[in-house]
Regions:
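Single conserved hydrophobic/aromatic residue that forms the stacking wall/gate
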Residues: 1-17, 21
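Compositionally biased, intrinsically disordered/low-complexity regions enriched for serine, proline
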Residues: 3-4, 30, 228
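Short beta-strand element of the conserved SAM-dependent methyltransferase core
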Residues: 4, 104-105, 216
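Feature targets compositionally biased, intrinsically disordered low-complexity regions
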Residues: 11, 26, 110-118, 222, ...
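Hydrophobic aliphatic residue packing
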Residues: 13, 20-21, 43, 50, ...
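Cofactor-centric catalytic regions
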Residues: 15-22, 34-35, 181-240
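Proteins synthesized as precursors that undergo proteolytic processing into mature forms
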Residues: 26-207
Length: 240
């Protein structure tokens, strides 16, 4: 098992897992946790895996509870558009689009010593909050992993970009700028190349792009599990 703590954290992984540290955190934690989307990923020793992404959209969602179930209903219908020419226009019987994008990636086997032919093996579980930028963030970290050979920690910590634009931005009234926000750790050559292609850039701080990616990479050949969490928020990767 390989675990990785965020580069800006001063807390060691072993001490963070201790009962003493847990009691310290419990004593200082806010009794009123922040709202917004939450994602976690879990893989156990038997290969069972979960990627859970929870969101009710706005704080308190629709502010309606389903009967006596205690389940708070979301207000994702704020994603509807009223323009009849828009693909996400409000219509009877139509399901609103949403941005929830948990990921499980599998490796297809053509054969092997285990005798499995055409089987699939789980190699990655990941996800992030971030509204419209969820797909963008997952695209970037998976590309880093698959095409550039990074491990999960490198993929999560690599410089990142994000973009939203009108009129496709999800949240009503669906109006925003059309800037490409890029972290300033990208090289000047890359920034110049983007501008030469017509992108309007907004250079932001080194860890200010969207997302709080959590990733677990499974190596079926070695039996190793590697985890990483985004240093842009308060995520953590830990194993036992």
């Amino acid at each position: 098992l390989m675990i990785r703590r965020p580069p800006r954290s001063t807390q060691g992984v072993s001490s963070a897992a201790s009962d003493v540290y847990k009691r310290q955190v419990a004593g200082t934690a806010s009794s009123r946790p922040e709202e917004d989307t939450t994602c976690f990923a879990v893989v156990d020793r038997w290969g069972n895996a979960v990627c859970q992404l929870q969101s009710i959209q706005s704080a308190w969602g629709s502010r309606l509870v389903a009967g006596d179930t205690g389940i708070l209903l979301n207000n994702r219908m704020t994603y509807w558009h009223l323009d009849p020419n828009h693909v996400d226009c409000l219509q009877p019987g139509k399901r609103v689009r949403h941005t929830m994008n948990p990921v499980m990636m599998f490796r297809t086997e053509s054969g092997g010593t285990d005798g499995i032919v055409g089987g699939e093996e789980l190699v990655l579980v990941c996800g992030t909050p971030g509204a419209d930028t969820q797909v963008q963030t997952n695209l970037q970290v998976i590309t880093h992993l698959v095409d550039f050979g990074m491990n999960v920690a490198e993929a999560v910590e690599a410089p990142r970009w994000r973009n939203t634009h009108s009129p496709t931005e999800s949240n009503f009234p669906h109006a925003c700028d059309d800037l490409l926000y890029v972290e300033n750790r990208l090289s000047p050559k890359v920034l110049a190349g983007l501008e030469s292609k017509g992108h309007q850039l907004e250079v932001i701080g080194p860890w200010e792009a969207s997302g709080s990616e959590v990733m677990i990479q499974i190596d079926p050949d070695e039996g190793a599990i590697k985890g990483a969490a985004d240093p842009r928020r308060d995520g953590y990767a830990i194993g036992w």
